[in-house]
Amino acid sequence: MNTLDALDAQSLRSDIPAFRPGDTLKVHVRVIEGSRERNQVFQGVVIRRQGGGVRETFTVRKVSFGVGVERTFPVHSPNIAKVEVATRGDVRRAKLYYLRELRGKAAKIKEKRETAPAS
């Protein structure tokens, strides 16, 4: 293993839950204002995940006061305090860019049902 791979392996985070495009996430972001630090929650739908390793990013979209807002986060960033999966979405695409043109209930993503094991 060369030096860069070893450095990348040290920077990877293991506390990030598994999530896919279509899932609704609560991303707790560390915000530093002057000398104070606080956590800010950004909740929205994952519209894409791209890259791999340390360079992996994901984009979350939400509608705030009628305006669509998208934020792209590095998965392994130290500025992310934690990531929670609010709901699992049932989608058939890896990139959900089509949500940008949809309004209201049309932009709603079906929730994935968890199948109970047969007993």
Swiss-Prot record:
HAMAP family: Ribosomal_bL19. Keywords: Ribonucleoprotein, Ribosomal protein. The keyword Ribosomal protein applies. This protein is located at the 30S-50S ribosomal subunit interface and may play a role in the structure and function of the aminoacyl-tRNA binding site. Belongs to the bacterial ribosomal protein bL19 family. Disulfide bonds: none annotated. The gene is rplS. PROSITE patterns: RIBOSOMAL_L19. This is Large ribosomal subunit protein bL19. GO terms for molecular function: structural constituent of ribosome. Pfam families: Ribosomal_L19. One of its GO terms (cellular component) is cytosolic large ribosomal subunit.
